[in-house]
Amino acid sequence: MKANPFNELEKSEKIRKPESMRSYMTIEEVQALIDTPMPHEEYEIVKCAYLFSCFCGLRISDIIKLKWNDVFVDRGQYRLAVSMKKTKEPIYLPLSPEALKWMPERGGKSSEDNVFDLPSANTIRMQLKPWAKAAGISKRFSYHTSRHTFATMMLTLGADLYTVSKLLGHADVKMTQVYAKIINKKRTRL
């Protein structure tokens, strides 16, 4: 075959990939989660890690490996120095006062200790659904929803796409544009 026959098709004739559906929490739903205790008190750390991610955008894989020596203060601003597990890209993430509220106290932990002492990934998943249900949330809910929530909240509150892309550690702004489309659809419905 000398040439790809699909190159001859008009754009309107090509099969379009469906847009990815990203589930995220509204500000009201995040508040409901804040107000709702975990069904099992010993898993309150799962709630803290989830809400921390809602306010900083880290993936669960990055929160699990987050150490106290990754947290530092630069000119009065708390930051994280994180090498993203998925992209291997190092980022320096500023922490908002809201994100800091959900970080556990360091106490006597060493700089090599994990910030969040989390149970297994399976246990985390099992604890999230009953917590969301208790908060009155019936939509699709996973740990990654917290990352989507961060992105949509940042864009809703006026952050530019490039900044949100950098905060999420995306290699390409195109990956972040999915969230901008969500915000635009949300605005047109209002």
Predicted regions located by residue number:
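Short, polar N-cap/turn motifs at the start of nucleic acid-interacting alpha helices
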Residues: 70-77, 138-139, 159-178, 185
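Short basic/aromatic active-site micro-motif
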Residues: 45-47, 119-121, 138-158
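Conserved tyrosine-mediated DNA breakage-rejoining catalytic core shared by Y-recombinases
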Residues: 11-12, 29, 56, 65-104
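Active-site/catalytic core of tyrosine-dependent DNA strand-transfer enzymes
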Residues: 94-138
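Helix N-cap/coil-helix junction residues
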Residues: 1-3, 58, 108, 137, ...
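Short alpha-helical segment immediately N-terminal to, or the first helix within
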Residues: 52-53, 66, 153-154, 167
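Basic, Lys/Arg- and aromatic-enriched nucleic-acid-binding interface segment
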Residues: 4-60, 64, 86, 110
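Catalytic-site neighborhood detector that most strongly recognizes the C-terminal catalytic loop/helix
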Residues: 24, 84-88, 168-190
